[in-house]
Amino acid sequence: MEQGVIEELIHLQLPEMEVANVVNVRDGNGNGNDIDGGNEVWAQHQLDNVNNRQMAILLDAPPEPPIVLHQLPQPVNVPQRLRKKRCFWTITKHFHAQPERCALLSNAWQAVQYVQPAQRSEHFANYMYKHMNSRNYPNGEGLPNRWGHF
């Protein structure tokens, strides 16, 4: 079902209204009441502007033409500016690799896991004293050879 466009002219009869022109006229006395003592040339210029048809059209005109959306220029795709790269020292990543440990410390840690938490420090010291000997580690092989090896 097609619908056609109907073009009709609609005439509205508007009631006639009287318009009062208000003109600000300077007074030489500072009262603003009369133009006798004021600047009569300036007052006449104001009246001429109101009675001038071209000036009246300019004063009645809207400040800007209406914006037609389909005539606006399309935004241009501009590549975004690269962000500042962060400093190496501020980037932190979780370290998943196990720290380097000697076999003695790994064995002591496993043995301590089965002891009550209150007695772990004493058990750890006893384990290290008992197992750190030349029979378990001949010629010191397997023992930590530098700081941080634990």
UniProtKB/Swiss-Prot annotation:
<keyword id="KW-0744">Spermatogenesis</keyword>
<comment type="function">
    <text>Post-meiotically transcribed gene that has a role in late spermiogenesis; required for actin cone progression during spermatid individualization.</text>
</comment>
<dbReference type="GO" id="GO:0007291">
    <property type="term" value="P:sperm individualization"/>
</dbReference>
<comment type="similarity">
    <text>Belongs to the male-specific scotti family.</text>
</comment>
<keyword id="KW-0221">Differentiation</keyword>
<keyword id="KW-0217">Developmental protein</keyword>
<dbReference type="InterPro" id="IPR031397">
    <property type="entry name" value="Soti"/>
</dbReference>
<dbReference type="Pfam" id="PF17079">
    <property type="entry name" value="SOTI"/>
</dbReference>
<protein>
    <recommendedName>
        <fullName>Male-specific protein scotti</fullName>
    </recommendedName>
</protein>
